[in-house]
């Protein structure tokens, strides 16, 4: 009887590389040709796509705009109570609000993507020779830094002191003051 499960496990296991494929829309870091300047915009495009998808979501947007005078949450004070607290900056009462914790993760996803893009742009910059290509690289880096700064702007406005990650190599992360983040 023990031979049947053993035979079945041997027949169903395989040495194929079917599961070792890269996810779609990804590139191995080792496979990037940083001498091909026509690909230099790709990491920037990734940041735009990430920012659009993660900072432009309806849940994130609700947490951001309800704090100003752009919109009122409407309804009674107990209707969507989380947005009522957010509009009054009472974030200590929102410790389990899914949209707020989602915004935290979304902002740091933009930060992480931006850090990776800046690292790629630095690698492209090492191989650029013409002044116009160097200026274009600097422009792309500025666009990426804008999105990272915008994500941090939202983070410090919502949470106060937050970890400042300027690269994706940090292992020990600590909170930085709002003032340090805004520099």
What are these regions (language model features)?
Residues 22, 71-72, 94:
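Intrinsically disordered, low-complexity regions of eukaryotic proteins
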Residues 25-29, 130-134, 166-173:
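Short linear capping/connector segments at secondary-structure termini
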Residues 37, 41, 45, 49-54, ...:
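Conserved, well-structured interaction surfaces
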């Amino acid at each position: 009887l023990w031979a049947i499960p053993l035979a079945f496990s041997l027949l169903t296991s395989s040495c194929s590389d079917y599961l070792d494929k890269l996810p779609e829309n990804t590139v191995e870091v080792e496979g990037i040709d940083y001498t091909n300047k026509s690909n230099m915009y790709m990491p920037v495009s990734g940041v735009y796509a990430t920012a659009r998808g993660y900072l432009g979501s309806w849940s994130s947007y609700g947490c951001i705009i309800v704090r100003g005078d752009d919109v009122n949450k409407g309804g009674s004070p107990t209707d969507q109570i989380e947005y009522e607290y957010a509009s009054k900056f009472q974030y200590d009462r929102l410790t389990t609000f899914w949209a707020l914790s989602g915004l935290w993760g979304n902002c740091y996803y933009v930060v992480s993507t931006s850090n990776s893009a800046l690292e790629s742009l630095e690698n492209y910059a090492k191989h650029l020779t013409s002044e116009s290509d160097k200026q274009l690289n600097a422009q792309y880096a500025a666009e990426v830094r804008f999105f990272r700064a915008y994500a941090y702007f939202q983070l410090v406005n919502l949470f106060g002191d937050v970890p400042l990650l300027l690269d994706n190599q940090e292992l020990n992360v600590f909170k930085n003051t709002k003032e340090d983040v805004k520099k």
